[in-house]
Amino acid sequence: MSWTVRIQEICRNHLSVKFWICKVLDMTNPGFTLVRAAEAEVLPASGVTLLVDAPDTAGALTSNRSRFDIGSAGAPPHFHAGAAELFLVLDGSLDVLLDEEIVTITAHDLLVVPAGMPHAFAPSAGCRADVVFVYTPSKPRFDYYRLLERLYTGDADQRELVETQDRFDNHYVQSAVWAARA
């Protein structure tokens, strides 16, 4: 029995396995989503590469790759009401706020932040970070990153970002722990 058939069997027999994993491995529907690096949309001011959005995965996930330079502000404290967020550090070091605790994740570490948990992130002091993010399940989010790009270039303002919190499931919060980390 091949490993894909075995995983399909596990998916069918264990309801705790996420639906989208089963869907991706369902050989009766061999559809898939492939994003070639050369074809991915790059947002140069923010360092974000858009990989795949919710409409391309039937809402299963959205993914992007972000490169953070030394001293980058990263993302302020926020939470996603309806999506877990996966972090996979490809290179460098990232400080991550998880509710009221800050942890550091480094190259090849994987972190999953559950829906509803306040979090923030930025490269660790003196470090860069290269990170793949996955949100699941997901609303369409690519326009959120395009809005951030416009903020970086001065073509949008903070008010626009605040007005999109429900649309993009990105809800900003305050954190004394994150503010004090300097």
Feature locations, PLM:
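A short glycine-rich, His/Asp/Glu-containing loop-to-beta-strand
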Residues: 40-77, 83-84
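Ligand-binding loop in jelly-roll beta-barrel domains
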Residues: 57, 115-142
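Tight coil/turn sites that cap or link beta-strands
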Residues: 71-72, 108, 116, 126
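Glycine- and acidic-residue-biased ligand/ion/polar-headgroup-sensing regions
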Residues: 82-84, 88-94, 99
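Short acidic-glycine-tyrosine-enriched beta hairpin
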Residues: 100-115
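Acidic/histidine-enriched, glycine/proline-rich intrinsically disordered or flexible terminal extensions
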Residues: 146-182
